[in-house]
């Protein structure tokens, strides 16, 4: 079954002005998922970088995902009062980051929903649009797993989706015993991904841009060009 056409678009790039949030044409918005396991990678994506793409690719390769949806958060609840770039720029950067890879699609469901962007609400919405034979896999790094107790309804998250947890420098993957102690039999739905970890963060990229330093090869080239063209992250 296809995901709702108003909420998921293929990663083709259209024209978008600064501060303008638009949806793609109908043909681009319809993602023909077609069964199997569907990865979900949420984030602020301010900006998206190769660490995000590598984590998604690591999960897809290990678990045989048919598609990975990148889901920018409109109002990330964990950011608090921390400033976040406008939604239009973050959506466009994410679209550009994934445009060249057919594995990826862009989900705008959190951009279209009012209120804080809680992952559990997004999974409920996505789950309702899928067949029973289709499985959602929530992709995260080990630091997110360590903090997931502070997320809204973490146990419900594990009911709605399997978890794929990748490595992050300074955050070792948990052992199976600890996961079973916390989640019981549901721990079998948590997949630990072995592979290289990249010591990279969006905040570090923003700092480098503000300092006038290169971000070449830390973000996709099209994302770098958009950051330069729009003067994003430069100190006033």
Walk through the language-model features, giving the residues of each.
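Nucleotidyltransferase catalytic core that binds NTPs
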Residues: 2-236
